Each structure stands twice: as structure tokens, then as C-alpha cells.
Amino acid sequence: QRMCPKILMKCKQDSDCLLDCVCLKEGFCG
């Protein structure tokens, strides 16, 4: 199971996101 805090963060790439979150195509981490 991925560790991804439920925080709405804008991103351009996966490395902009916290822990195991990835950058979704909507432009937010998830």
C-alpha cells in the first residue's frame, strides 16, 4: 500500500509530490 498523505498539492512531475504520491494528469498529487 502506498503512503500518500491526503493533501491537495499541485505538481508537474512525481518528484514534486510527497512520499509515494505520484503526479496525476489533472496536475495534482494523488
From Swiss-Prot:
<dbReference type="InterPro" id="IPR011052">
    <property type="entry name" value="Proteinase_amylase_inhib_sf"/>
</dbReference>
<keyword id="KW-0722">Serine protease inhibitor</keyword>
<dbReference type="Pfam" id="PF00299">
    <property type="entry name" value="Squash"/>
</dbReference>
<feature type="disulfide bond">
    <location>
        <begin position="17"/>
        <end position="29"/>
    </location>
</feature>
<feature type="disulfide bond">
    <location>
        <begin position="11"/>
        <end position="23"/>
    </location>
</feature>
<protein>
    <recommendedName>
        <fullName>Trypsin inhibitor 3</fullName>
    </recommendedName>
</protein>
<dbReference type="GO" id="GO:0005576">
    <property type="term" value="C:extracellular region"/>
</dbReference>
<dbReference type="InterPro" id="IPR000737">
    <property type="entry name" value="Prot_inh_squash"/>
</dbReference>
<keyword id="KW-1015">Disulfide bond</keyword>
<comment type="function">
    <text>Inhibits lysyl endopeptidase and trypsin.</text>
</comment>
<comment type="similarity">
    <text>Belongs to the protease inhibitor I7 (squash-type serine protease inhibitor) family.</text>
</comment>
<feature type="site" description="Reactive bond">
    <location>
        <begin position="6"/>
        <end position="7"/>
    </location>
</feature>
<dbReference type="GO" id="GO:0004867">
    <property type="term" value="F:serine-type endopeptidase inhibitor activity"/>
</dbReference>
<keyword id="KW-0646">Protease inhibitor</keyword>
<keyword id="KW-0964">Secreted</keyword>
<feature type="disulfide bond">
    <location>
        <begin position="4"/>
        <end position="21"/>
    </location>
</feature>
<keyword id="KW-0960">Knottin</keyword>
